[in-house]
Amino acid sequence: MIVAVGTKNPNKIRAVEDAYRLFGIPARIVPAPRPLTTPPQPVGLEAVLKGAVERAKAALQAVEKAEHGVGIEAGVVEAGGVHLDITIAAIVDAGGRTTIGFGPAFQIPPPFLSQVLSGVEMGAVAEQYFKRPSIGYREGLIGVLTKRRVTRYHLNLAAVAMALTPRLPHNSQLYLKP
């Protein structure tokens, strides 16, 4: 199966490869450019979800013979007065079916919040604060905060695995629309 992924980020690509492998689904992963309509730092659950779905649809259309398009989007949501960084994955197939998965979310450090809420990408804020380049393409902010015990890869892997769950053969009857 050819799986198109709406990113060039190696963390996301590896997470998609490993999620499909985790469930024994043979897949050739092909990176595709992210759509230009996706903001660099989506704020709000609907905006993050929309970004993931747009990435998945654009990837599916961009890669010839792809059976799945996968989009992974991280963004900011508010819950209980706390701002969290959340990762959402969407998988779209050629038949138009979309499945969604969420990864773990973590609390955004207060010094980052105003810039992130104004649309500055979390990775850029973290790179400036910690004076380290390419954090988003490496361990991610969560990797810095946890000293690499949990990395951006782990958040991406969890989100994609959750989006794959309804597609697993033993779950097919559970997820049929009534």
UniProtKB/Swiss-Prot annotation:
Names of required cofactors: Mg(2+); Mn(2+)
Keyword annotations: Hydrolase, Magnesium, Manganese, Metal-binding, Nucleotide metabolism, Nucleotide-binding
One Gene Ontology molecular-function label: metal ion binding
Enzyme Commission numbers on file: 3.6.1.73
InterPro entries: ITPase-like_fam, Non_canon_purine_NTPase, NTPase/PRRC1, YjjX_NTPase
The organism's place on the tree of life at top rank: Archaea
SUPFAM superfamilies assigned to the protein according to its UniProt record, in alphabetical order: ITPase-like
GO annotation, biological process: nucleotide metabolic process; thiamine metabolic process
Reactions catalysed according to its record: XTP + H2O = XDP + phosphate + H(+); ITP + H2O = IDP + phosphate + H(+)
Note describing how the cofactor binds: Binds 1 divalent metal cation per subunit; can use either Mg(2+) or Mn(2+).
Alphabetized Pfam families for the sequence: NTPase_I-T (PF01931)
Assembly information from the UniProt record: Homodimer.
HAMAP family: Non_canon_purine_NTPase_YjjX
Recorded family membership: Belongs to the YjjX NTPase family.
PANTHER family referenced in this protein's UniProt entry, alphabetically: NON-CANONICAL PURINE NTP PHOSPHATASE_PRRC1 DOMAIN-CONTAINING PROTEIN (PTHR34699:SF2), PTHR34699
Function statement: Phosphatase that hydrolyzes non-canonical purine nucleotides such as XTP and ITP to their respective diphosphate derivatives. Probably excludes non-canonical purines from DNA/RNA precursor pool, thus preventing their incorporation into DNA/RNA and avoiding chromosomal lesions.
Protein name: Probable inosine/xanthosine triphosphatase
Organism: Pyrobaculum aerophilum (strain ATCC 51768 / DSM 7523 / JCM 9630 / CIP 104966 / NBRC 100827 / IM2)
